[in-house]
């Protein structure tokens, strides 16, 4: 299996949600499996998104410490340039997205990573950007 860039939506489900639905529990187990196999990739912008909005200092510190297990994959100038290209391409087709989402797409594309996400926006990006998104069938079974 190749390396997986895990999107903020998955991390948020794993770290913040108290009660998981059956499909979310399967996704959590899949994520744990990827972590154990050392297939998970982290980038700084995802780390920032995960940590943003946590007003409780103790919870912030605990989550920050938990995430220290994952070093940040280095983002290159080419990644930033391609993210801008993806943004422009998708926007011209009427698809809106965040700058960080397009950066995730770019880093994944440039480094042959798959993306694990719960964010349906990535399906819209995939129509115009060559990215590999892990299908639910891979973790629901």
PLM regions and their residue ranges:
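Acidic, PIN/NYN-like endoribonuclease modules and their adjacent C-terminal/linker elements
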Residues: 1, 30-32, 105, 109-141
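Active-site neighborhoods of divalent-metal-dependent phosphate/nucleic-acid chemistry enzymes
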Residues: 72-118
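A secondary-structure boundary/capping signal
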Residues: 6-8, 46, 118
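Short loop->beta-strand "edge-of-pocket" segments that line small-molecule binding or catalytic clefts
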Residues: 4, 39-42, 68-74, 114
């Amino acid at each position: 299996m190749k390396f997986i860039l895990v999107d903020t939506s998955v991390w948020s489900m794993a770290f913040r949600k108290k009660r998981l639905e059956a499909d979310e529990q399967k996704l959590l187990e899949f994520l744990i499996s990827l972590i154990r196999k050392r297939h998970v990739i982290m980038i700084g912008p995802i780390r920032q998104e995960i940590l943003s909005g946590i007003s409780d200092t103790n919870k912030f510190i605990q989550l920050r410490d938990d995430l220290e297990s994952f070093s940040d994959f280095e983002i290159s100038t080419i990644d930033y340039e391609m993210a801008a290209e993806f943004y422009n391409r998708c926007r011209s087709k009427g698809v809106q997205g965040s700058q960080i989402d397009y950066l995730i797409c770019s880093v994944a594309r440039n480094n042959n990573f798959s993306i694990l996400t719960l964010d349906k926006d990535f399906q819209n990006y995939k129509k115009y950007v060559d990215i590999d998104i892990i299908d639910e069938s891979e973790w629901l079974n």
